[in-house]
Amino acid sequence: MICVGIDVAKDKHDCFILSSEGEILADVFTIQNNAEGFDTLLQTIRRYTRPEVKIKVGLEATGHYSYNILGFLLDKGLPTYVINPLHTNLYRKSLSLRKTKTDRVDARTIAAMLMSDVDLKSYTDTAYHNEELKSLTRYRFDKVRERAKLKQSVSRLVTILFPELEKLVPSLHLASVYALLSEFPSAKQVAGAHLTHLKAVLSDASKGRYGRDMAATLRDAARRSVGSIMPAKSLELKHTIRLIRELDAEIEDIETAIQAIMDEMQSPITTIPGMGVRMGAVILAEIGDFSRFDSPDKILAYAGMSPSTYQSGQLSLSGAYSHMEKRGSRYLRYALYNATKYVCHWDPTFAAYLAKKRAEGKHYNVALSHAAKKLIRLIYAMEKSQQSYRNAA
């Protein structure tokens, strides 16, 4: 067996090749982070291998810097291990008391870790899907948050330009309202619109739900409006609505990509009543490989949902007086709480559990956190057994 250690950087990678007998086959050499460099690495590896020789390639998880070299290695069919830098650091310290930290040392350390057969798992298709899913779900999270801020801006601008509008429609954030405000971004412009044209705009955007009566109601309200006449704010409103529409389209594209990966993964998580694809995808993406966790409690700690304990001298606060740690993955914590709300609504077992906790006098959010813990234990069991909800429950 040969072990290849790669220390990844932005522009270049340091590599080291070691045999299972401890022989240095290729002392630390540097390749550029480009096609020529990747080919050099591949040819060097092949120089020391035969069909019967097992290969292990290891590199540190360095975020986006490792994506391209990792993809290349996987495409060439080389078993690749992505190692947490913390583990590399601890392993290096266990080998030497000297505080040496260079790329050359790291390349050797990674190869030595592979040779020592410490508990490492090779990068798999599942890991690839999880990484893709994490990128997509976090990207969607950011886009949705960006859209929410823009919607707040719309509400603020409507309060200035046409404050009566909000009481005449179920929500300002309807396609019909956006269509109206895109063409008539102030009460004055709505008041001066031809009724037939106003009706056509509303009818087309609402798919016939709003017609002449709504158009007349809005125009009458606009003519009595106390809204300000501020062309700059009207322009800002039009541009803000356009940005929201663009974000709507982008989010839809992201959700399509998420759905495609979820279809390929075929996780049983979406068989839980109330567990949608979007929240299920975030949970799977943030947890990643379930085999990394010995128990559901480890996942709860990773999500920052374990109760914290304060201890000073003889004083120890825990149990009823403890608070959630709120460390770990905020994305996972967000998804678990939101998914739990829906699961408690749609599933009788979880609904009864939430009601039981509320009957014990617990605040709604505290009761919900208990239900979230119950949910993560269920998900853990389902992912381990690959059974659907009804079989796992």
Name these PLM-found stretches.
Residues M1-A393:
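A detector of single, family-specific signature residues
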